[in-house]
């Protein structure tokens, strides 16, 4: 079975057996709680970039680099043509969250801030947080290198104290890394288990699968390991009601082989050294795009 079939089967199951529920956005969802996890092989430089519709690769990579660099200003992405955070960073949305004192685009202490500065006092998206808080991402990298059997290689974006200050609380909120130690002289292998409390199956999950796969490849590259597997456990897995028609089209399509990742240059040793141009995705031949509206 193709790894993408797990995703398609989950959508079918949600559509057939899920509960109709109201939601924060007012759109309405069909929801299933805690479905079986999704497992994607990352071996041989595989990237599980969904093929039953074209996925916005540039947006995925730019957002991931925005996370890993600890940034929280959505305008940085928007200026690069990546508009995925524009709705949540708009002045009207910030005002609806009681955050109208912030300038447009300032999302608050969201993902990247928690990854790189957990526990620091958030001022605004323009402040310098160098050396402040816990740099969880660097700690994960250090542990993978120095203590690979550690059971505490955790990266958490969920900080209850900071949630009221966030434009949107984290959906993909925690991951754990695991180093498989070989019996021979082969490279150690790195796997990632990610938990996502809220999973928009139509728009969000294709992004999240590829993003955490690429993050695992990045961390493997700078730790001298090789990426093995991405496992994703979902909490509230849902289909927005205005995505049903589009997903029915997608479900008719046959998955194609996943692409491979190649690094454009040698010598990347630090997680902050990666640039968009370093990610070369080879062999991506998806079906055409399918338009779906984002609920804000």
UniProtKB/Swiss-Prot annotation:
Keywords: Methyltransferase, Nucleotide biosynthesis, Transferase. Homodimer. GO terms for biological process: dTMP biosynthetic process; dTTP biosynthetic process; methylation. Belongs to the thymidylate synthase family. InterPro entries: Thymidate_synth/dCMP_Mease, Thymidate_synth/dCMP_Mease_dom, Thymidate_synth/dCMP_Mease_sf, Thymidylate_synthase, Thymidylate_synthase_AS. It holds the Pfam family Thymidylat_synt. It is an enzyme of class 2 (transferase). It catalyses: dUMP + (6R)-5,10-methylene-5,6,7,8-tetrahydrofolate = 7,8-dihydrofolate + dTMP. Gene3D superfamilies: Thymidylate synthase/dCMP hydroxymethylase domain (3.30.572.10). DUMP binds at residues 24, 151-152, 197-200, 208, 238-240. Pathway: Pyrimidine metabolism; dTTP biosynthesis. (6R)-5,10-methylene-5,6,7,8-tetrahydrofolate binds at residue 200. The keyword Methyltransferase applies. GO terms for cellular component: cytosol; mitochondrion. This is Thymidylate synthase. Its EC number is 2.1.1.45. The active site is at 171 (nucleophile). It comes from Agaricus bisporus. One of its GO terms (molecular function) is thymidylate synthase activity. The keyword Cytoplasm does not apply. The gene is tms1.
């Amino acid at each position: 079975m193709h790894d993408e079939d797990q995703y398609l089967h989950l959508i079918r199951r949600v559509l057939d057996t899920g509960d109709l529920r109201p939601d924060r956005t007012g759109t309405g969802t069909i929801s299933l709680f805690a479905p079986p996890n999704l497992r994607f092989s990352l071996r041989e430089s595989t990237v599980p970039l969904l093929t039953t519709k074209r996925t916005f690769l540039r947006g995925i990579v730019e957002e991931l680099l925005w996370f890993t660099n600890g940034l929280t200003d959505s305008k940085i992405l928007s200026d690069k043509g990546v508009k995925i955070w524009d709705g949540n960073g708009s002045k009207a949305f910030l005002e609806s969250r009681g955050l109208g004192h912030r300038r447009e685009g300032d999302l608050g202490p969201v993902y990247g801030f928690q990854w790189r500065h957990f526990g620091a006092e958030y001022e605004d998206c323009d402040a310098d947080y160098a050396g402040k808080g816990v740099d969880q991402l660097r700690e994960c990298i250090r542990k993978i290198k120095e203590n690979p059997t550690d059971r505490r290689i955790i990266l958490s974006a969920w900080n209850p104290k900071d949630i009221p200050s966030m434009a949107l609380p984290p959906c993909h909120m925690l991951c754990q890394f695991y180093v498989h130690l070989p019996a021979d002289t082969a490279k150690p292998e790195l796997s990632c288990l990610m938990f996502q409390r809220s999973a928009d199956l139509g728009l969000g999950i294709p992004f999240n699968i590829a993003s955490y796969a690429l993050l695992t490849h990045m961390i493997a590259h700078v730790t001298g390991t090789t990426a093995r597997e991405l496992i994703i456990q979902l909490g509230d897995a849902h289909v927005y009601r205005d995505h049903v028609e589009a997903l029915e089209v997608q479900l008719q399509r046959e998955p194609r082989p996943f692409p491979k990742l190649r690094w454009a240059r040698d010598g990347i040793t630090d997680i902050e050294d990666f640039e968009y141009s370093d990610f070369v995705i080879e062999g991506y031949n998806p079906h055409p795009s399918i338009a779906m509206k984002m609920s804000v």
